């Protein structure tokens, strides 16, 4: 398969991208999570390059892209503009858009603009409401053993989330609701290690459970009916982006399918790679057939 890597100028910085495949299907553009994570956790999607072009990129501040240390930069508007810039630079006139976690939030925002040539959405382990995420996070927390739950609550209340005790407790939570493979594959370790905490904390906050940053009041649930492209909504049974959140998205969209991966948490592309890829592949093929 054809592989291409490059950098796209964007507002005085550069966005790094990787393009795999050049088959006849409508291209797939992939949006990673975080905010502040990288494309690495979604590299299994490159296997779909046997049927279509698959483009992954590191959002500004992340991975191989420019990393300006300017907290005022980190807004939804910036990342929407970057997405459109990537699409135009690479000539993606028609495109399927797959967003994972925060990337799914960005994908919903983009779809609400009703851009020309958007063929479908795949919303993977995502959310439509920061408030519902908070409620579901508290529910998941309540089910944790006290030796995990209490340090999480205490250090978040005290603002000491850099304390080693907190880090051990959050790691135990992540083994339940981020990735359930034991041990974690090196890919998962690298995704966590490479996260840009300035971007993450500015956009989301210091705690996974309690959004306090730019996205704290984010909610597009009431507007999902405005998105008229076919959509595939995905999550893991043990996902921190819980099945209730996935169901909320799927019910709000006019044309959506919902698939839950029974052995996965938040990283189904890594935890159940074969089933995840088969599910996405089949959906894209069905939509391509409907697309004139």
Give residue ranges: language-model regions.
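N-terminal cap/lid segment of alpha/beta-hydrolase-fold proteins
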Residues: 1-14
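Conserved HGGG/HGGXW glycine-rich cap/lid loop of the alpha/beta-hydrolase fold
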Residues: 11-68, 72
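Alpha/beta-hydrolase active-site loop signature
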Residues: 35-36, 59-63, 103, 128, ...
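Active-site loop/oxyanion-hole signature of alpha/beta-hydrolase fold enzymes
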Residues: 55-102, 106, 278
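Conserved hydrolase catalytic core segment
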Residues: 93-136
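Alpha/beta-hydrolase
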Residues: 142-144, 150-229, 248
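Conserved loop-alpha-helix segment in the C-terminal half of the alpha/beta-hydrolase fold
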Residues: 214-264
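Catalytic active-site module of serine/aspartate enzymes centered on a nucleophile-bearing elbow/loop
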Residues: 255-292
């Amino acid at each position: 398969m054809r592989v291409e890597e490059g950098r796209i100028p964007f507002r005085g910085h550069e966005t790094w991208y990787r393009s795999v495949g050049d088959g006849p299907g409508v291209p797939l553009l992939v949006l990673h999570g975080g905010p502040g994570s990288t494309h690495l956790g979604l590299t299994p999607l490159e296997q779909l390059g046997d049927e279509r072009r698959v483009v992954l990129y590191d959002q500004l501040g992340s991975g191989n892209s420019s990393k300006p240390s300017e907290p005022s930069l980190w807004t939804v508007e910036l990342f929407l503009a970057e997405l459109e810039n990537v699409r135009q630079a690479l000539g993606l006139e028609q495109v399927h858009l797959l967003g994972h976690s925060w990337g799914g939030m960005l994908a919903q925002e983009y779809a609400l603009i009703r851009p020309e040539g958007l063929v479908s959405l795949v919303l993977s382990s995502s959310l439509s409401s920061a408030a519902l995420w908070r409620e579901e996070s508290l529910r998941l927390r309540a089910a944790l053993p006290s030796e995990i739950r209490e340090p999480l609550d205490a250090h978040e209340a005290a603002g000491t989330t850099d304390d080693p005790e907190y880090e051990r407790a959050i790691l135990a939570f992540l083994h339940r609701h981020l990735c359930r493979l034991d041990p974690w594959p090196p890919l998962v370790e690298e995704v966590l290690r490479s996260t840009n905490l300035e971007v993450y904390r500015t956009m989301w906050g210091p705690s996974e459970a309690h959004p306090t940053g730019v996205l704290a009041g984010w909610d597009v649930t009431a507007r999902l009916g405005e998105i008229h492209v076919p959509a595939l909504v995905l999550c893991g049974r043990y996902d921190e982006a819980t099945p209730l959140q996935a169901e909320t998205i799927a019910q709000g969209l006019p044309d959506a399918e919902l698939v839950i991966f029974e052995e996965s948490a938040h990283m189904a592309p890594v935890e159940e790679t074969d089933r995840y890829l088969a599910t996405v592949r089949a959906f894209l093929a069905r939509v391509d057939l409907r697309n004139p």
